Amino acid sequence: MSATEHSFWPKATGLETAIPEDRRIDGIAEVTYQKLLAPIGGRRQTALAFEDEVNVFRRTLMHMGFPYSSRWYHTSTQAPTQLRDVLYFRRKDGVKSGSFKTFVQDGLASQLATIPEVTEVRTQVYLPWNKATWNTPNVAHDNPKEDHLHASIILGFADQAAREAFYANLAPQLNAEVVQYASAVHVYHIEKTLPFVLDGKRM
């Protein structure tokens, strides 16, 4: 993820959009399974990623979700994705996890999927974070409770003009609802994607 192009979600009262430098995320190691039992068959690939992580990241935080807590959405635009951003959300104090999940998946993401020139929408809603879930060696895993993140949305755009128009014109309108459920939105531009395992084979 970009080390310089981040923190560009529109500002709103009560919403943290500037990412503290010591909490900035370098990248994402994302694993998506086709079936509920697929993780059992992928243990060898998971072990490879576990050992290799120190070569890529300085701090990693493993976020997991229940089955069906991740969604891929059909968008109104069928053009290929040229640019991607990832939005991380911190749940607002007092908001129940079920209400937050409904907002992310059925509210915000569903709206995003209908926007022209948005070519990709993917959501993940996380279980409570636990360091023991992914305690890779020689990589930092510190994650104070006040810094926890609870969901993410990956957005794809057809081109740079569409991306700029979204953040300038549409994203500010979404904040009226976002601030009811989230206390922070941290946005990063995804510079490149590097497959580690594809079709069960190490790249």
How would you name each of these model-derived features?
Residues 1-203:
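Macromolecular interaction modules
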